[in-house]
Regions:
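C-terminal lobe and pocket-closing loops
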Residues: 273-288, 297-396, 426
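Extracytoplasmic/periplasmic solute-binding protein
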Residues: 135-136, 140-144, 149, 173-222, ...
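Hinge/lid segment of periplasmic solute-binding proteins
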Residues: 98-148, 173, 189, 201-204, ...
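Paired acidic/hydrophobic, glycine-rich loop segments that form the ligand-binding mouth/hinge
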Residues: 92-95, 268-273
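Short helix-initiation/N-cap motifs at beta->coil->alpha
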Residues: 68-79, 99, 169-174, 249-263
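Conserved N-terminal structural module of periplasmic/extracytoplasmic solute-binding proteins
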Residues: 4-102, 121, 285, 300-301, ...
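A structural signal for short loop-to-beta-strand junctions that line the ligand-binding cleft
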Residues: 81-83, 89-92, 120-157, 189, ...
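Glycine-centered hinge/linker elements that transmit conformational signals in sensory
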Residues: 176-180, 220-251, 296
Length: 428
């Protein structure tokens, strides 16, 4: 998830966010400049600009320079790590994939926010989002936007052929074959998902493992604790491509490539995030009024499918020279007011459950209550400081299985050996 460059003057909304008594104090008397690193928000409009203007009008004593991070999450993390490791990163507030919080906190790169937050402040957010902001009982970040993996489907095509949204992957495959045979459209793809070698591929595989009733890390720390089921998941994903149920370019596909193809009416099913829902309903969208939402399916060996929950948090660099201003900015952008503005833009979904049932927002975005329920049913990626090592080790192995360079059995065996060695060296 990633965003356009804004350079705006901002200010610390202490009164608005209620942190006047609990914020750390900056020294000096003149305006301070806070550098905010964020990624481009994917949606119909960018909500940051009006929020930053509002913030600047309230508090002209703080100047905020908002700067865009690279496009992909892997490149974002690389940029942040390189700069944070030097101890003088050149930015104060950063947008974080929530899965990075334990790693960044353990490395000493984040300011511990616990002393500066009123008790219970994180209780207004989804429990999974609040938990992702914590490490070893301390609060290291503030939840900003929420994500969950969803199944999008062409409701018009399913209705035309007397089908319901699939609850299993066997039903999804059968629906693709039935609809394509009846439609006679050689350009109509079946199931779009993210198979490029990056974090998105790991997420898709994690969801496949959950759908099969297994996971990547066992309670005892074993990698792929049920190797046979893991191999079956990889065979299924590879088979989607080789059997033409997913396009051959799946192995180079990310969120935007798949979202655009589905949005042009070129596929029956899509695995993606909530941001896509509002883009499909734009006035000029070829699929407007034709798209439904459902949970991700399950495999025959599983009891239920589950989308990966995630999203973005805001953290404050431990080396900031302006902690009061930085925390004020982070609290403003994650406040109920700011999350409402962001939700109204259609760019992102909030981390505050109450907004999913707000009458005005539901009128504008009828899918919100459904997304709320699917978010509650989702599952987080493994919460561990070693997650990035887990992900970066898995990415080439999983990609090799998808393109047929390795068999699923080889991928699972090689991944287990490498990861168990690395994780043991890190103490898990």
């Amino acid at each position: 998830m990633t965003r356009p460059i804004l350079v705006v003057c901002l200010a610390g909304a202490l009164a608005l966010t209620g942190c006047a008594d609990s914020s750390p104090r900056d020294g000096g008397g003149g305006p301070v400049t806070v550098v905010f690193k964020h990624a481009k928000l994917l949606g119909p409009v960018d909500p940051l600009a009006p929020l930053l203007v509002e913030f600047a009008a309230l508090h002209p004593e703080i100047r905020v320079r908002a700067e865009a991070l690279p496009w992909s999450s892997d490149e974002q993390r690389q940029f942040l790590v390189i700069n944070l490791e030097g101890g003088n990163p050149g930015f104060d507030v950063m947008m974080l994939d929530c899965i990075w919080v334990p790693e960044f906190a353990r490395a000493g790169w984040l300011l511990d926010l616990t002393p500066f937050l009123p008790p219970g402040e994180l209780a207004a957010h989804f429990p999974s989002a609040a938990e992702a902001a914590r490490y070893r009982g301390r609060d290291w970040a503030l939840p900003w936007m929420m994500n969950v993996g969803l199944l999008y489907y062409r409701a018009d095509l399913l209705a035309r052929h007397g089908l319901r949204p699939p609850e299993t992957y066997d039903e999804l495959v059968a629906a693709i074959r039935r609809i394509r045979a009846a439609e006679g459209n050689p350009r109509l793809e079946g199931y779009l998902w993210q198979g490029k070698q990056y974090e998105g591929l790991v997420v898709n595989v994690l969801e496949g493992l959950w759908a099969a009733g297994t996971r990547v890390l066992g309670d005892d720390g074993r990698v792929f604790p049920d190797p046979e089921r893991a191999e079956a998941v990889l065979r299924f994903l590879r088979g989607l491509i080789t059997e033409g149920l997913s396009p051959p370019w799946t192995t180079a596909a990310d969120e935007e490539i798949t979202r655009r193809a589905f949005g042009q009416g070129e596929a029956i099913f899509l695995r993606s995030w909530p941001y896509a829902a509002d883009l499909f309903e734009l006035p000029d969208s070829p699929v407007r009024g034709k798209v439904g939402l459902a949970p991700l399916p399950r495999h025959a060996t599983g009891t239920a499918g589950a989308g990966s929950t995630g999203g973005a948090h805001l953290g404050v660099a431990r080396g900031t020279r302006h902690p009061e201003a930085a925390i004020t900015l982070a609290r403003f952008l994650t406040s109920e007011r700011a999350q409402r503005v962001m939700a109204e833009s259609g760019a992102v979904k909030p981390t505050r459950p109450a907004l999913y049932h707000d009458p005005a927002l539901v009128r504008a975005f009828p899918s919100l209550p459904r997304i709320h329920d699917l978010t509650l049913a989702g599952r987080p990626r493994p919460v561990t400081p070693a997650y990035v090592i887990l992900s970066t080790t898995l990415q080439p192995e999983l990609s090799a299985a998808l393109v047929g360079v390795k068999t699923p059995a080889e991928t699972v065996a090689h991944s287990r050996r490498r990861l168990e060695f690395l994780l043991e060296g890190l103490g898990g």
